[in-house]
């Protein structure tokens, strides 16, 4: 195991450089194509804002992640850590393409859920089971499937105001990096976090910091929710149960409490009522 070789560092620097350029190009493109813009919720922005920055974000993540993986420049040997790591890439791409279709053509929430369940079922092979000594493995499969889909939607739901999802994701990635250095317990979650941290920081500081010039949209929040679930269950597979829950506890609890209240009041779970706790200071 090595912390970071020079090739890894160079590739990350190039990724940051080209990502900034690509995002500014996409930002300028949105000024010419109205389809790429959206009206801000809660009237936080006077004019329409460039939407679906996830098109650039997700494309850069999968390209540079694949480059590092195929050139053997990641910090650890993935094939020794998880079964069939290529499945992670394939499912990510399908999530991205599905979100892209949904954004511009529309998918019924039920169909969207069916697709998510199907893709996560395929991605279960990227997690090392069993996760515990007291739950039957088949029950673990079912629980991971359910909660992984839930993490995807938690990530998507908190993408409701400037910088919120970016900050939440940064909390996840930075905690994993710091925890890895402190414990010396290197996992694939560390590699993913090293790549996503600079991408997310650039997006937050240059494009998404209030008031945002760009929203990441479903093309970013859905694939990133999938990756967040992978990171969390990778930590759980290493026995880090409390840590895995703690670093994602706020969005999990906010969304869970809000959905329970919404259901009790007779609303569908996916109804856009803007009643999450993180939105209340903004709306007020």
Predicted regions located by residue number:
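Short, Lys/Arg-enriched N-terminal segments with co-localized hydrophobic residues
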Residues: 1-3
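"…together with the soluble PPM/PP2C metallo-phosphatase catalytic core" -> "…together
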Residues: 5-256
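Membrane-proximal soluble regions of multi-pass membrane proteins
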Residues: 54, 247-284
């Amino acid at each position: 195991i090595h912390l970071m070789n020079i090739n890894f560092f160079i590739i990350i620097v190039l990724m940051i450089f080209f990502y900034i350029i690509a995002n500014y190009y996409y930002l300028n493109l949105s000024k010419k194509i109205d389809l790429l813009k959206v009206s801000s919720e809660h009237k936080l922005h006077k004019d329409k804002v460039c939407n679906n920055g996830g098109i650039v974000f997700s494309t850069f993540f999968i390209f540079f992640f694949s480059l590092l993986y195929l050139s053997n420049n990641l910090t650890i040997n993935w094939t020794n850590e998880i079964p069939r790591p290529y499945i992670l890439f394939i499912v990510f791409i399908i999530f991205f393409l599905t979100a892209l279709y949904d954004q511009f053509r529309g998918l019924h929430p039920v169909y969207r859920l069916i697709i998510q369940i199907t893709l996560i079922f395929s991605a279960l092979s990227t997690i090392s089971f069993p996760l515990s000594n007291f739950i039957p493995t088949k029950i673990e499969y079912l629980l991971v499937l359910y909660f992984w889909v839930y993490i995807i939607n938690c990530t998507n739901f908190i993408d409701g105001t400037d910088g919120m999802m970016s900050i939440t994701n940064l909390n996840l990635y930075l905690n994993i990096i710091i925890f890895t250095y402190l414990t010396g317990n290197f996992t694939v979650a560390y590699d993913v976090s090293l790549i996503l941290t600079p991408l997310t920081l650039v997006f937050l500081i240059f494009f998404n910091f209030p008031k945002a010039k760009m929203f990441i949209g479903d093309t970013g929040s859905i694939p990133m929710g999938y990756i967040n679930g992978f990171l969390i269950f990778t930590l759980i597979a290493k026995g880090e149960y409390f840590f895995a829950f703690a670093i994602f506890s706020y969005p999990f609890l906010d969304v869970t409490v809000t959905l329970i209240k919404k259901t009790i009041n007779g609303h569908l779970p996916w109804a856009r009522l803007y009643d999450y706790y993180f939105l209340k200071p903004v709306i007020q």
